[in-house]
């Protein structure tokens, strides 16, 4: 019985420590870094607020600073010209392009898709996102692609309008994880999956509370049982 209680305590505490952002980063947390440093140059997440990134371990100060660096539409001035203001944590993570026309102009006529629900709407979900990111290849002889198209074997039509976004070592993970192309593709796919399914993070938080409760109850039960055993004649 003692061994069972001890194992329960150790297992619960181990799971608890694994779940804490301050102790160890998760693929989704690393994926947020990839989004910030790579994806956000062309893509937005209109259905996600900056403040939602707290679920991925981003501190309130980091959220405010990130948001404040972005300018979002804020009506027009007295001359009818568009105005902007710094974003706040309550604002959505908009596309970096001020309008669709400029977005298309900068990308050979194609508008980079919003990533809020991509892992939900794309056939194959996060696995397909990862495959696309890892399936760029040189264009075969005899195959001609239009300007702004890149050969990619993960797609039925074998081309995509997005240039290869990931390169080994292009960023540094704070937890020391090596930023290989495969690792970054795995991480950002996990992040986009969690973004598309926002209740996943909430379930993890609830699970963290449950694990904490179970660990404390196991310790109290163990101590109470020891006390009962010692009090026996």
List where the protein language model places each region.
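Juxtamembrane interface at the cytosolic side of transmembrane helices
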Residues: 203-206, 217-233
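Mid-length scaffold segments of soluble, non-membrane domains
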Residues: 106-145, 151-153, 161
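Juxtamembrane/start-of-transmembrane alpha-helix segments at the extracytoplasmic/lumenal side
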Residues: 196-214
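Bacterial N-terminal signal peptides
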Residues: 7-19
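Boundary at the C-terminal end of the N-terminal hydrophobic targeting segment
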Residues: 22-24
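C-type cytochrome heme c attachment motif
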Residues: 33-45, 94-98, 111-120, 131, ...
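Extended, hydrophilic extramembrane loops/domains of integral membrane proteins
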Residues: 162-197
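Sequence/structural segment immediately N-terminal to covalent heme-attachment motifs in c-type
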Residues: 26-45, 208-213, 217
């Amino acid at each position: 019985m003692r061994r069972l209680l001890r194992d329960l305590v150790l297992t619960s505490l181990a799971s608890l420590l694994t779940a804490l952002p301050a102790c160890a980063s998760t693929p989704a947390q690393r994926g947020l870094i990839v989004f910030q440093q790579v994806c956000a140059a062309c893509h937005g997440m209109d259905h996600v607020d900056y403040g939602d990134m707290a679920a991925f371990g981003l501190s309130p100060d980091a959220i405010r600073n990130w948001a404040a660096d972005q300018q979002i539409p804020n009506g027009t001035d007295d001359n009818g010209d568009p105005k902007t203001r710094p974003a706040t944590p309550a604002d959505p993570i908009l596309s970096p392009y001020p309008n669709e026309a400029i977005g298309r102009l900068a990308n050979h006529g194609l508008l980079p898709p919003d990533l809020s629900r991509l892992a939900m709407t794309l056939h194959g979900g996060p696995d397909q996102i990862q495959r696309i990111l890892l399936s760029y290849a040189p264009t075969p002889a005899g195959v001609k692609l239009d300007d702004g198209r890149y050969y990619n074997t993960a797609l039925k039509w074998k081309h995509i309008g997005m240039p290869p976004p990931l390169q080994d070592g292009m960023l540094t993970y704070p937890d020391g994880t090596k930023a290989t192309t495969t690792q970054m593709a795995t991480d950002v796919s996990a992040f986009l999956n969690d973004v598309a399914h926002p209740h996943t993070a909430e379930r993890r938080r609830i699970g963290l509370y449950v694990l904490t409760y179970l660990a404390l109850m196991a310790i109290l039960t163990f101590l109470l049982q020891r006390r009962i055993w010692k009090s026996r004649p």
